[in-house]
């Protein structure tokens, strides 16, 4: 079976003549099929050039006709233009056209009018479509590669049409273009459009959701001040772009490595037009690591462990609290329906393990993964981004707690304006901090110390100098000997904790303080 493709400029009289002859042949011949492509005068020339380049043809006028063997596949066979098709039809089928020039012109004018009307209708429909604009900043970074499929397949944002904006630096533009092509190749139905850019205001144009991947390669000890200034400058430019072009109800989720809390605080300070509760940082990486270790201990799926809380500075000192953690599906003495859960601390029933081996494994988890992979744990980061964004947009499982770094409004005596990781519950489009967590004195001291560190860290970010060069290195996690817990942050916490020693409690045994990847029992 042969299919003939006839393409032409809408106002071309010769296209009109060829089109009507092909219609006549199709009506008389069972295996003769016609497909038509009509382009406006503005569209025709670039479209024809691209078609010929793709197929290795040489043709410069309207119309162009080629033949495709649809039951065999392979490359189309170029027939040519008006005269070539007329000769082809006369030679093979004994048919020709006697259409006069005046009629050809009239039909061409009618074709042009109809084509323009169709284009206007398409444009009207396009304007009426209101996809969700999602931008990914630093999209050439590895975590984005794992997040994007979940964004466009409906897993995160459900059945929302998406206009995807990918941004990165000029040096990564070719990577962005490759990523754009690959996302197109996924053929997911909810992807309305996709664009790549190196311009931040363009990336944030009408954006409803933004994922900012903070994953800069650090230059090492000598470049600490330069790294700091680069980060702060970048976040100020991000804030400026959000103020200029983003939707006023945009949700901004920051993820990655480094001093995220302080950087998010700077971002909030410079986006006065955006509600500060609409900007947050991912805190679920450490939370998921703790859940995984607890699940392995209890021989359950890690999805069955919930309500692990990570307090504090996502990129620095954190307090990992499992005192309220619950486990579903545990094979214990008491069984119940899927909704039934038990206390993790009670089921582990081993404070020595919680205070020792658990903390050691949690301390080394990230390094162990990175050493095995020979690169950062991008899949873990992507999963944390995906679940956090999904919960924020759709709501989280009822009654469960999750960790999120947000701007404090005085929660748990953390000063207003400090970005801190708290336990939260998500509702559709919003979150709320859970404020009924019981705290002992040790925990209050630790959170107070972490708060002081965050205030100091933000000041270091904004005013880096040679005088505080060593402190800058610690903010970036650059140390001379990573096997030695030399962090001043950790020392400060331990000093303050020793001042208020108390009897061991299940709550204290089920918590951990972590400075980056250094973890000690509380």
Swiss-Prot record:
Gene3D superfamilies in the cross-refs: Lactate dehydrogenase/glycoside hydrolase, family 4, C-terminal, NAD(P)-binding Rossmann-like Domain
MF (Gene Ontology): L-malate dehydrogenase (NAD+) activity
InterPro entries registered for this protein in UniProt: Lactate/malate_DH_C, Lactate_DH/Glyco_Ohase_4_C, Malate_DH_type2, NAD(P)-bd_dom_sf
Protein EC: 1.1.1.-
UniProt keyword annotations, A-Z: NAD, Oxidoreductase, Tricarboxylic acid cycle
Residues covered by region (Disordered): 495-522
Family (UniProt): Belongs to the LDH/MDH superfamily. MDH type 2 family.
PANTHER family reported in the protein's UniProt record: MALATE DEHYDROGENASE (PTHR23382)
Protein name as it appears in the record: Putative malate dehydrogenase 1B
Species annotation: Branchiostoma floridae (Florida lancelet)
């Amino acid at each position: 079976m042969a299919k003939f493709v006839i393409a032409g400029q809408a106002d071309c009289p010769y296209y009109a003549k060829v089109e009507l002859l092909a219609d006549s042949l199709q009506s008389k011949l069972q295996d003769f099929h016609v497909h038509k492509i009509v382009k406006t005068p503005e569209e025709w020339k670039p479209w024809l050039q691209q078609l010929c380049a793709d197929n290795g043809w040489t043709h410069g006028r309207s119309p162009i006709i080629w033949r495709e063997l649809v039951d065999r596949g392979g490359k189309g066979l170029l027939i040519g233009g008006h005269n070539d098709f007329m000769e082809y039809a006369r030679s093979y089928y004994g048919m020709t056209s006697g259409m006069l020039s005046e009629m050809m012109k009239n039909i061409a004018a009618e074709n042009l009018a109809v084509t323009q009307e169709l284009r206007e209708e398409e444009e009207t429909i396009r304007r009426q479509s209101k996809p969700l604009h999602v931008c990914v900043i630093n999209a050439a970074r590895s975590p984005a590669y794992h997040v994007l499929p979940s964004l466009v397949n409906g897993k995160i944002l459900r059945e929302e049409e998406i206009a995807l904006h990918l941004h990165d630096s000029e040096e990564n533009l070719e990577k962005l273009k490759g990523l754009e092509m690959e996302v197109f190749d996924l053929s997911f139905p909810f992807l309305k459009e996709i664009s790549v850019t190196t311009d931040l205001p363009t990336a944030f144009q009408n954006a409803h959701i933004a994922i900012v991947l903070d994953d800069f390669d650090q230059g090492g000890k000598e470049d600490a001040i330069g790294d700091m200034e680069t980060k702060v400058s970048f976040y100020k430019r991000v804030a400026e772009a959000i103020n200029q072009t983003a939707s006023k109800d945009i949700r901004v989720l920051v993820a990655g490595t480094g001093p995220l809390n302080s950087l998010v605080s700077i971002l909030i300070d410079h986006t006065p037009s955006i509600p500060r509760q609409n900007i947050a940082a991912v805190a679920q990486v450490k939370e998921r690591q703790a859940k995984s270790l607890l699940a392995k201990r209890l021989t359950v799926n890690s999805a069955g462990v919930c309500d692990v809380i990570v307090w504090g500075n996502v990129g620095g000192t954190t307090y990992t609290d499992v005192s309220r953690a619950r486990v579903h599906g545990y094979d214990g003495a008491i069984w119940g329906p899927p909704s039934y859960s038990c206390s993790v601390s009670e089921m582990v029933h081993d404070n020595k393990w919680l205070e020792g081996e658990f903390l050691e494994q949690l301390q080394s988890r990230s390094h162990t993964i990175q050493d095995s992979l020979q690169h950062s744990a991008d899949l873990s980061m992507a999963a944390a981004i995906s679940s956090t964004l999904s919960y924020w947009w759709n709501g989280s499982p009822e009654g469960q707690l999750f960790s999120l770094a947000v701007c404090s409004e005085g929660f748990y005596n953390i000063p207003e304006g400090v970005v801190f990781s708290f336990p939260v519950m998500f509702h559709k489009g919003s979150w709320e901090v859970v404020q009924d967590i019981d705290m002992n004195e040790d925990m209050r001291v630790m959170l107070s110390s972490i708060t002081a560190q965050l205030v100091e860290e933000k000041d270091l970010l904004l005013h880096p100098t040679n005088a505080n060069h060593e402190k800058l290195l610690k903010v970036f996690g650059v140390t001379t000997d990573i096997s030695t817990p030399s962090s001043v942050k950790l020392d400060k916490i331990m000093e303050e904790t020793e001042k208020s020693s108390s009897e061991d409690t299940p709550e204290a045994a089920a918590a951990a303080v972590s400075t980056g990847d250094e973890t000690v029992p509380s």
